[in-house]
Amino acid sequence: MGKTNSKLAPEVLEDLVQNTEFSEQELKQWYKGFLKDCPSGILNLEEFQQLYIKFFPYGDASKFAQHAFRTFDKNGDGTIDFREFICALSVTSRGSFEQKLNWAFEMYDLDGDGRITRLEMLEIIEAIYKMVGTVIMMRMNQDGLTPQQRVDKIFKKMDQDKDDQITLEEFKEAAKSDPSIVLLLQCDMQK
């Protein structure tokens, strides 16, 4: 293991320009910042959790970060390299609504079986509540829903065939037909 290259290889850069929503210049800047924070060129779960803790200092971000990490780590090797990082960032920050829905579904589908169960959804919603902290959550959560009540409300709107699981199709259809569902998923009730 030598020192990680401080520059992206031209073929990697070209590939990322083609497969993300970032320009060549933006990718170079992101890579520079990524190497500054991760000199090894990869992030493990603990390092990833530390980044989340910086962004959410008033709550416990560790559980949510664990789920985000799983979603970022496309090859399942227990680390996030720059490619995985920038591709996920591209989708979450600049992707189409459809791409964002696919990414969110992946995060909620904990076991990757193509369906979201009530327990899976509850785990993510509880992690969001913990991450943002009690005081902020009380401000955001003007409807006063507990995590379980929020899950029940989401399932009522999304689970079209009432089989207690949400497929990708149900997820997308409901989110497109009722944008307030997306707010429920984010636990952001500010209008």
Swiss-Prot record:
Keyword Metal-binding part of the UniProt annotation: yes
Binding site for Ca(2+) 2: D109, D111, D113, R115, E120
Protein name: Hippocalcin-like protein 4
List of residues binding Ca(2+) 3: D159, D161, D163, Q165, E170
Role played: May be involved in the calcium-dependent regulation of rhodopsin phosphorylation.
Database matches in Gene3D superfamilies: EF-hand
Bilayer-spanning residue ranges: none
GO biological process, one term: regulation of signal transduction
Further information: Probably binds two or three calcium ions.
Keywords: Calcium, Lipoprotein, Metal-binding, Myristate, Repeat
Single GO MF descriptor: calcium ion binding
Binding site for Ca(2+) 1: D73, N75, D77, T79, E84
Calcium is among the record's keywords: yes
EF-hand domain: residues covered: 24-59, 60-95, 96-131, 146-181
Source domain of life: Eukaryota
SMART domains referenced in this protein's UniProt entry, alphabetically: EFh (SM00054)
Lipid-bearing positions (N-myristoyl glycine): G2
Family as reported in the entry's similarity comment: Belongs to the recoverin family.
Endpoints of the signal sequence: none
